[in-house]
Curated annotation (Swiss-Prot):
Keywords: Chemotaxis, Cytoplasm, Hydrolase, Phosphoprotein. Belongs to the CheB family. PANTHER family: PROTEIN-GLUTAMATE METHYLESTERASE/PROTEIN-GLUTAMINE GLUTAMINASE, PROTEIN-GLUTAMATE METHYLESTERASE_PROTEIN-GLUTAMINE GLUTAMINASE. The gene is cheB. GO terms for molecular function: phosphorelay response regulator activity; protein-glutamate methylesterase activity; protein-glutamine glutaminase activity. Involved in chemotaxis. Part of a chemotaxis signal transduction system that modulates chemotaxis in response to various stimuli. Catalyzes the demethylation of specific methylglutamate residues introduced into the chemoreceptors (methyl-accepting chemotaxis proteins or MCP) by CheR. Also mediates the irreversible deamidation of specific glutamine residues to glutamic acid. Pfam families: CheB_methylest, Response_reg. It comes from the Bacteria. The lineage of its organism: Bacteria, Pseudomonadati, Pseudomonadota, Alphaproteobacteria, Acetobacterales. InterPro entries: CheB-like (IPR008248), CheB_C (IPR035909), CheY-like_superfamily (IPR011006), Sig_transdc_resp-reg_Me-estase (IPR000673), Sig_transdc_resp-reg_receiver (IPR001789). This is Protein-glutamate methylesterase/protein-glutamine glutaminase. The modification 4-aspartylphosphate is found at D59.
Length: 351
């Protein structure tokens, strides 16, 4: 690896002594660099999101959540090379095979040798091998989560905007990857401009952007834009457990608007709850403020655009003064913040 960047590693082990021993061993290996250590899966979750390491070493035996449980979450939500570490490898043969099917790249035994050699002397080699392996989708493993009714798609993003929103939405969605969280948008505009707006966004951003239609099932990688003028856009539960769909409702205008941001946000608060992220962007008056407050009360994360970057600081201001905005950010920071919140919420929740 001469001249190559060292592999960044996060070490997860409930034993402070073991973490120190691993750190000491890896400091002697120029091929790797420890960027963080964690004593629990919950600490590890935050480090993974923040540091994006090349490889994770994961202790199999930990309190609160064992290594296999955490491995399942990592491989489903943020696939990466993982080296499972155990002090009793010979007694875990079945679990070794299971973890490899789930996506682990390596198992490493930390048993102390008879001649007193460093039990982690070979861990650097295991990390390098793990990093060299092509990450593949894990084979599904049956768990109790199959019976749960938490939505399979994870977090849903709802965004409301008015004056200045066309440019603001272009900026926010420009940060989204192809496989973005399912996103529903209400942008105040006449009906005749909605379709061309959605087509324009679809051409310039990575996810698919389309006008929302009755019964559209929300899925990752797709952004659903409400058509202006005739009907409100709401999100409701689908016919099958764990699904959300678009609902178009012919009802009177709310706050002088149809579709209304409040209508969308209220539906997300009721249907999606804490698995939602609500965002209110530039626009005049107050549409969306009460709905965003309902989302926050339901446990959702909420973001408001700040005054300096807003064309009209009306809707964001109304929401902020109402206490509906958890975090106020400049426009350029909102897209990355949405993705970060979605990653954190996904790592906190079994689907």
């Amino acid at each position: 690896m001469s001249g190559a960047r060292p592999l960044t590693v996060v070490v997860v082990d409930d034993s402070l002594t073991t973490r120190a021993l691993i750190a000491a061993a890896l400091r002697r290996d120029p091929r790797v660099k420890i960027v963080g250590t964690a004593g629990t899966p919950f600490e590890a979750r935050d480090l993974i999101v923040r540091l994006n390491p090349d490889v994770l070493t994961l202790d199999f035996e930990m309190p609160s959540m064992n290594g296999l449980q955490f491995l399942e979450k990592i491989m489903r939500l943020r696939p990466m090379p993982v080296v499972m570490v155990s002090g009793h490898l010979s007694s875990h043969r079945g679990l070794v095979e299971q973890s490899l099917r789930m996506g682990a790249a390596e198992w490493y035994s930390k048993t102390t040798t008879a001649n007193g050699e460093d039990p982690f002397a070979g861990l650097g080699d295991a990390i390098v091998r793990a990093a060299a392996m092509k990450q593949q989708a894990p084979v599904p493993v049956a768990t109790d989560s199959a019976n749960r009714t938490v939505p399979k798609i994870g977090t849903v993003v709802g965004i409301g905007a008015s004056t200045g929103g066309v440019e603001a939405l272009t900026d926010v969605l420009g940060h989204f990857p192809v496989a973005c969280p399912p996103t529903v948008i209400v942008q105040h505009m006449p009906r005749q401009f909605s379709e061309s707006f959605a087509r324009r966004l679809d051409r310039i951003v990575k996810p698919e952007v389309r006008l929302a239609e009755e019964g559209d099932m929300l899925k990752p990688g797709t952004v659903y834009v409400a058509s202006g003028g005739e009907r409100h856009l709401r999100v409701r539960c689908g016919a099958r457990s764990g699904e959300y769909v678009c609902q178009l409702v012919a009802a009177p205008p709310v706050n002088g608007h149809r579709p209304s941001v409040d209508e969308l946000f209220y539906s997300l608060a009721t249907t999606v709850g804490k698995n939602a992220v609500g965002v209110i962007l530039t626009g005049m008056e107050c549409d969306g403020a009460q709905g965003l407050l309902a989302m926050r009360h339901a446990g959702a994360s909420t973001i408001g655009q700040d005054r300096a970057s807003s064309v009209i600081y009306g809707m964001p201001r109304a929401a902020y003064e109402l206490g509906a905005v958890e975090t106020q950010l400049p426009l350029s920071a909102i897209g990355p913040a949405i993705l970060n919140l979605c990653e954190r919420r996904s790592l906190e929740t079994y689907p």
